[in-house]
């Protein structure tokens, strides 16, 4: 009599971690596509972020997954992979000192310009779910209540199409909107079932779009202020330096740049920027016009 055959153990998709070689390939794609740096010791992080993608695609191993994302058919999945490897964390009025500077030093001149028919452009670069851009919008509406009826626009961009869609929906749960001061909640947030939605004026100010900061930018006009916070921490030093230079080229003279609490922009003689506050910089060249 033959011995019973043990059942074959089938590992669920994504349960086997990437090999060192596969991790190196994933890191190379992330760096080439988006300038993101993944350290060699981040295998468990990569597995935890990408396992759900392998499960969704029914792929048992990272070799098969890599073959797919490198193929022409895998272009969209390549973008999803990049999105999964970054952390989409944002809060309303995060690092509030930036919004105080924005309110007290940036907006008075911009509001006066808009009132006289001038153009105002702002950018939330790496906007995540939209909280930063809508914090900018609420602060702007406090300074200029009819801003949405003037030539004033906020661009909110992110590499992740899913967070861009959530930002465009402009709907958040009670916990998410809790950092919004009560007076602003009453003015700019409307009940939407169990959630809250930004009012029409705030939504009208913000345009969301997918944008890879590491790729070409389609925008032609200059910005008066750029918020790019806790984004370049994923980049290596050369990619960071290149991005600061590109922001300098995208800002109007005297334009403002706000970065994350752990990020620093070279400032002073020989650089395009001067320090204007905590993690706040201003492009040289006179007052914004």
What is each model feature region?
Residues 129-147:
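Conserved SAM-binding loop of SAM-dependent methyltransferases across substrates and taxa
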Residues 102, 226, 251:
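Residue-level signal for inorganic ion chemistry
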Residues 125, 146-227, 231-242, 264-266, ...:
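Extended basic-aromatic, gly/pro-enriched interface segments that bind polyanionic ligands
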Residues 2-123, 260:
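Conserved AdoMet
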Residues 225, 266-289:
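Core SAM-dependent methyltransferase catalytic element
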Residues 241-253:
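A short glycine-rich, Lys/Arg-flanked "PGG" loop and its adjoining helix->strand segment in the class I
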Residues 254-261:
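Conserved beta-strand signature within the Rossmann-like core of class I S-adenosyl-L-methionine
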